[in-house]
């Protein structure tokens, strides 16, 4: 790739950001699309966020992704955000529109696309159990409700956090029944058979962590399991689900799909199908 004075710049800001797979998949797509654009990572400490955003604005960067821990903190630094981003309470994509920096959120759409592509799952009329109540859970819950889910149960160690999500969404999505419960394994084991999909939005599953005692065998054999964790590739949760023959998927599909959505926002063009996923899988040796 030749970088010239006309090359347009995209990027990702986060802390840390060296582990991000986004530069690999975005640059693969940009090259395949024949665009004179480049996508680079920017390591931005939390205390430097305001000055970093001001710098990106001044330098004329065309757009950038936003990852942990900046997805909420960046909102007051932008000129405006979309209704989707406001609903999610977070921004993961920023586009320069004239002199303005506009915040978007593609996490929800990426999640729904991944459910369809990786599990063949459509939320309309379905009952879903979501583990966790953080930012990833908020995106999942909102997108599931928008997709017509009948019931969304939020299980979190702090029930109050789960109840906050219930209160945030129950007046917005009248067709979905929301509820919160403790992330207590015996309680979940007693209820898990009532759901068509289980979604883990927590970091449990990374490293040596696991949901000790969670009995996936109680789920309906036709139910599906989605774990947003993708390192390791097969978490203990997914390993147990697959042993029972249930359809399961990790978060790689969501990572790729939200990136595809972001690139379409920046360029006005859809990336070639599969190019981002293939690049990510090659990097992970999958």
Swiss-Prot record:
In short, the EC number is 1.1.1.25
Q: According to its UniProt record, which residues of this chain constitute the active site? A: 71
Q: Which GO terms describe its cellular component?
A: cytosol
- Quaternary structure and interacting proteins, as annotated: Homodimer.
Q: Which residues take part in binding NADP(+)?
A: 132-136, 228, 251
Query: What is the scientific name of the source organism?
Result: Geobacter metallireducens (strain ATCC 53774 / DSM 7210 / GS-15)
The protein's annotated pathway: Metabolic intermediate biosynthesis; chorismate biosynthesis; chorismate from D-erythrose 4-phosphate and phosphoenolpyruvate: step 4/7
Its recorded name reads: Shikimate dehydrogenase (NADP(+))
Q: Where does shikimate bind?
A: 20-22, 67, 92, 107, 230
Which biological process terms from the Gene Ontology are attached to this UniProt entry?
amino acid biosynthetic process; aromatic amino acid family biosynthetic process; chorismate biosynthetic process; shikimate metabolic process
**HAMAP family on file:** Shikimate_DH_AroE (MF_00222)
Q: Identify which top EC class this enzyme belongs to.
A: oxidoreductase
- Keyword field: Amino-acid biosynthesis, Aromatic amino acid biosynthesis, NADP, Oxidoreductase
Pfam families on file = SDH_C, Shikimate_DH, Shikimate_dh_N
Source domain of life is: Bacteria
What biological function has been recorded for the protein in this entry? Involved in the biosynthesis of the chorismate, which leads to the biosynthesis of aromatic amino acids. Catalyzes the reversible NADPH linked reduction of 3-dehydroshikimate (DHSA) to yield shikimate (SA).
Q: Which InterPro entries match?
A: Aminoacid_DH-like_N_sf (IPR046346), NAD(P)-bd_dom_sf (IPR036291), SDH_C (IPR041121), Shikimate_DH (IPR011342), Shikimate_DH-bd_N (IPR013708), Shikimate_DH_fam (IPR022893), Shikm_DH/Glu-tRNA_Rdtase (IPR006151)
The protein's GO terms of the molecular function aspect are:
NADP binding; shikimate 3-dehydrogenase (NADP+) activity
Q: Which reaction does it catalyse?
A: shikimate + NADP(+) = 3-dehydroshikimate + NADPH + H(+)
Sequence similarity: Belongs to the shikimate dehydrogenase family.
Q: Which Gene3D superfamilies does the protein's record reference?
A: Leucine Dehydrogenase, chain A, domain 1, NAD(P)-binding Rossmann-like Domain
């Amino acid at each position: 790739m030749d970088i010239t004075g006309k090359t347009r710049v995209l990027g990702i800001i986060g802390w840390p950001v060296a582990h991000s797979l986004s530069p690999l998949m975005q640059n693969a797509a940009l090259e395949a699309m024949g665009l004179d654009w480049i996508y680079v990572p920017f390591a931005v400490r939390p205390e430097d966020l305001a000055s970093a955003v001001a710098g990106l604005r001044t330098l004329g960067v065309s757009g950038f992704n936003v990852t942990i821990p900046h997805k909420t903190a960046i909102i007051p630094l932008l000129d405006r955000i979309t209704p989707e981003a406001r609903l999610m309470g977070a921004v993961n994509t920023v586009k320069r529109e004239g002199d303005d920096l506009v915040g978007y959120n593609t996490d929800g759409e990426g999640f729904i696309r991944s459910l369809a592509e990786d599990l063949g799952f459509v939320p309309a009329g379905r009952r879903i159990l979501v583990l966790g109540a953080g930012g990833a859970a908020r995106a999942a819950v909102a997108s599931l409700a928008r997709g017509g889910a009948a019931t969304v149960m939020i299980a979190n160690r702090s029930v109050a956090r789960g109840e906050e999500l219930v209160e945030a969404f129950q007046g917005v999505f009248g067709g979905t029944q929301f509820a919160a419960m403790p992330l207590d394994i015996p309680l979940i084991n007693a209820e898990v058979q009532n759901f068509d999909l289980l979604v883990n939005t927590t970091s449990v599953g990374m490293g040596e962590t696991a949901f000790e005692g969670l009995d996936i065998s109680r789920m309906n054999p036709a139910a599906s399991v989605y774990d947003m964790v993708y390192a390791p590739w097969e978490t203990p949760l997914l390993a147990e689900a697959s042993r029972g023959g249930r359809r399961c998927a990790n978060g790689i599909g969501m990572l790729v799909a939200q990136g595809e959505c972001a690139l379409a926002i920046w360029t006005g063009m859809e990336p070639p199908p599969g190019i981002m996923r293939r690049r990510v899988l090659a990097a992970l040796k999958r």
